[in-house]
């Protein structure tokens, strides 16, 4: 008997999700924003990991003074910085939207500040790499 009641409750809850009508455009936009922020967080993790790896390569560059390593690090820094500058413009534009609630606005503003910090860190590392005198 308890099992039948439990099944009825589960079925009622699952069906009630289909009965409640939500504006489909708003639902899509929130789903898009959620997916966008998940992708953004994943890419920022990758860039932060890449920045850590480039910092380690910079330490190696200080020891070896290799011209090839210096050029490789500068290329990777340039690519990451350009990617972040494009993402910064997009996130600033999204943060200006008027349909955002307080939580969504906070997410976009946090994304903007995160990107600005990473761009600054990449630029500082690029200055350090350029300052290293290579042997060649």
From Swiss-Prot:
Result, substituting residue 120 to A: Decreaced IgE-binding by some of the 24 patients tested
Effect seen on changing residue 75 to A: Decreaced IgE-binding by some of the 24 patients tested
Organism per entry: Dermatophagoides farinae (American house dust mite)
Single GO molecular function: protein homodimerization activity
Result of changing residue 121 to A: Decreaced IgE-binding by some of the 24 patients tested
Effect of residue 133 to A: Decreaced IgE-binding by some of the 24 patients tested
Protein name (record): Mite allergen Der f 21.0101
Subunit structure, interactors included: Monomer. Homodimer.
Impact reported for residue 59 to A: Decreased IgE-binding by more than half of the 24 patients tested. Identified as a major epitope
Tissue expression from the record: Highly expressed in foregut (stomach), midgut and hindgut. Not expressed in body wall, reproductive system or body cavity.
Family, per entry: Belongs to the mite group 5 allergen family.
Effect of residue 56 to A: Decreaced IgE-binding by some of the 24 patients tested
